[in-house]
A protein has these predicted regions:
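Canonical leucine-rich repeat
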Residues: 77, 97, 118, 141, ...
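C-terminal capping segment of individual leucine-rich repeats
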Residues: 60, 70, 80-83, 90, ...
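Non-Sec secretion/translocation targeting segments of pathogen effectors
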Residues: 1-15
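Consensus "Asn ladder" position of solenoid repeat domains
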Residues: 72, 92, 113, 136, ...
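Leucine-rich repeat domain C-terminal region
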Residues: 219, 233-267
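Conserved hydrophobic beta-strand positions in leucine-rich repeat
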Residues: 67, 87-89, 108-110, 129-133, ...
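LRR N-terminal entry segment and analogous cap-like coil->beta motifs
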Residues: 35-96
Length: 267
């Protein structure tokens, strides 16, 4: 299923409204980082760090909100990214990303890297709403404190467990193609799409998703669906194919008043 782009235009917000006191420091760090490419295995593409450093400097000086560093084969995180609200680092070779102090960050895309760990923004003023990090090597993530998140996609990783009870504004959640055996989501009144397909789930916890439009739980190990019937009132797409469902309660089908696509085959 094609995921919507997370790099839509965001509201103007000058990154220069509150200039960093340590601006000179991070620019010096950026120059130092640029010269370290040979020590980090990037000698085969020495121009990549030069290009990244140039983009960061130009974007900052021209007061841009977003920075695109995709496809530069980077193996380490460049300095200076805390100045931007939207960061695109798709198609690199990063194994770790630290956004702990990125208070301005709203949208982050780290698709198709080699991520094994990530630190998300922390604190009271965190405003991040969109995170996409499909096609990585993540086993564990902690987004439970990201109360402002509305879009989260971490498909094609190695996640075994996810907890996101505090993400009350979540609208889009894609955790397909992982190793999930359990997920604790809590009540999500804003959730519209939930994709948990291609995992190892044996059951689903009771939780309230009153506005859920699309539920994809195919290709798991589910023997039953323990969800409140009220979750299905607005469902238009439900795919529970390729599980181990033994009995389908016909009473459950009466709640699918809005259904347009239903798959229960191979159970």
């Amino acid at each position: 299923m094609k995921s919507p782009s997370i790099f839509n235009k965001i509201k103007p917000q000058s990154i220069q409204q509150h200039p960093e006191k340590n601006q000179l420091n991070w620019m010096l760090e950026l120059n130092k980082w640029k010269e370290e490419r040979i020590l980090t295995g990037e000698i085969h593409r020495p121009e990549c760090r030069n290009e990244a450093a140039e983009r960061i400097s130009c974007a900052f000086l021209s007061k841009q909100n977003d920075i695109d560093l995709s496809g530069l084969n980077l193996t380490t995180q460049p300095p200076g990214l805390q100045n931007f609200t939207s960061i695109n680092l798709d198609n690199n070779q990063l194994t770790h990303f630290d956004a702990t102090n990125y208070d301005r960050l709203v949208k982050l895309s780290l698709n198709s890297n080699a991520l094994e760990s990530i630190n998300f923004p922390q604190g009271r003023n965190v405003s991040i709403t969109h995170i996409s990090m499909n096609n990585n090597c993540l086993r564990n993530i902690d987004i439970d404190r990201l109360s402002s998140i509305t879009y989260f996609s971490a498909a094609h990783n190695q996640l075994e467990f996810v907890q996101l009870e505090s993400c009350e504004w979540l609208q889009y959640l894609n955790l397909s193609h992982n190793q999930l055996t359990d997920i604790i989501a809590g009540n999500k009144e804003e959730l519209l799409l939930l994709d948990l397909s291609h995992n190892k789930l044996t059951s689903l916890h009771n939780a309230l998703f009153p506005n859920l439009n699309t539920l994809l739980i195919n290709n798991n190990l589910l023997s039953e669906i323990k969800m409140f019937y009220s979750n299905f009132c607005n469902i238009q797409t439900l795919n529970a194919a390729n599980n181990q469902l033994e009995n389908i309660n016909l009473h459950f089908l009466t709640y699918l008043s809005s259904i347009k696509s239903l798959r229960l085959d191979n159970n």
